[in-house]
Amino acid sequence: MKEQKLIHEGLITESLPNGMFWVRLDNEDLVLGYISGRIRRSSIRILPGDRVKIEVSRYDSTRGRIIYRLRNKDSNE
C-alpha cells in the first residue's frame, strides 16, 4: 500500500545548493524541501519569497518534496 503524504503550503525562506530550500509552512514549521523531478525537468525557477506546495511524509516531518510553485494570485494571502 502506498504511503499517504501530507500536502502543505509554505514560503521559501532560503535557497541551498542542489535544488534544496528551507520552507516555512503556514503552521510556522520549518521544513527542508527538495525540488521534484517534474519541476526540475520543466526548469521552473524557484526563488526565496515564492509560495509553494510541499509534500511531507508522515514519518519524517522535517523533509519534504516541493511539488508546485504557486502564482501570486493562487496563494491564500
From Swiss-Prot:
Residues 1-71 form the S1-like domain. It holds the Pfam family eIF-1a. SUPFAM superfamilies: Nucleic acid-binding proteins (SSF50249). GO terms for cellular component: chloroplast; cytosol. It is found in: Plastid, Chloroplast. GO terms for molecular function: ribosome binding; rRNA binding; translation initiation factor activity. Keywords: Chloroplast, Initiation factor, Plastid, Protein biosynthesis, RNA-binding, rRNA-binding. Its main location: plastid. The keyword rRNA-binding applies. Component of the 30S ribosomal translation pre-initiation complex which assembles on the 30S ribosome in the order IF-2 and IF-3, IF-1 and N-formylmethionyl-tRNA(fMet); mRNA recruitment can occur at any time during PIC assembly. Belongs to the IF-1 family. One of the essential components for the initiation of protein synthesis. Stabilizes the binding of IF-2 and IF-3 on the 30S subunit to which N-formylmethionyl-tRNA(fMet) subsequently binds. Helps modulate mRNA selection, yielding the 30S pre-initiation complex (PIC). Upon addition of the 50S ribosomal subunit IF-1, IF-2 and IF-3 are released leaving the mature 70S translation initiation complex. This is Translation initiation factor IF-1, chloroplastic.
